[in-house]
Amino acid sequence: FPLPCTRNGVYSTDINTDWTPGFYTGMCWLAYEATGEEVFRTAALQQVDSFAERLVRNENLDHHDLGFLYTPSCVAGYRLTGSTAARNAALEAAARLTKRYQPIGQFLQAWGQINDRKEYRLIIDCLLNLPLLWWAAEQTGDPRYSKIARAHTATAAKVLFRPDGSTSHTCYMDPVTGKPVCAMTAQGYRADSAWARGQAWGILGMALAYRFTHEPAYLEQFRACAAFFLKRLPEDNVPYWDLIFTEGDEPRDSSAAAIAACGLYEALPCLPEAERTAAQQAADRLLTALVEHCAAPKRPGGGVLLHGVYCKASPYNTVTNYGVDEANLWGDYFYMEALTRRTRNWRTYWA
């Protein structure tokens, strides 16, 4: 599998061990749906086997990103081929994800040892891990999965979404009272800014949350989150890595635009006609900007979408620069998904 991001424009490879291989398999499934060519189906099914083997090895699975891993790979594979192996792997991953649930605070703990006070928190990215639980509830009839997904969504809506429509990346919770302690950032510029990719997760995550729950409040949060994102775009419609920036030389994050476009397309059936037209136009502008400014030329080992950011250091966060102005797997995947959503009557892998 490709590593999470390119280095000097080229992906290195490793076994199925990081949080991102599901996006690569998802791209194989998208390519299969677009072309009907068996080479993509065969490759994707071979990769599904590696996801099942990873569960047996218990290889780096003690975190919340099981949805990113198993939805675009195994859930998609089951839907497209009826593969029993894909279904079983996805159900096992969903069962493991429930073990991250913290009843005190009602959220899925993102990282670290369960009940570690230093890691007692949720992050906005996890909204895209919840579809695995909704799918498992549908498949098994076990309400435990949907109850956890619903509870986490409600907590995220309360503690990660600000009144102005911007979002926090992460929020620490009190393990005794379950109340929020403080909202912080891990990969954004600073705690009170809006990390662009996190904002995009919020857009797509709330659009999906509304699909699953039909809660009007989640559609309103989608609207506010999308409006904030769109008003912070520079003239070329490719967002900076943090939305605190609207001009200058800071790196752009093309992956945030791709994810946000998918969120806007996802919400279209839920919107009144005039609003639907505006949302479609906004999504089209984002997608056009990616095609014009970020689409990668064909290159062995290269990515699909240039100018992404994995981590960007700032005076206020603790990350080091990694994958800055490079392609990354989630950007490549969601760019392909956005193109698919725009050009086909496509059933999403996420719902």
Cite the ranges covered by each PLM segment.
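Glycan-recognition and catalytic cores of secretory/periplasmic carbohydrate-active enzymes
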Residues: F1-A351
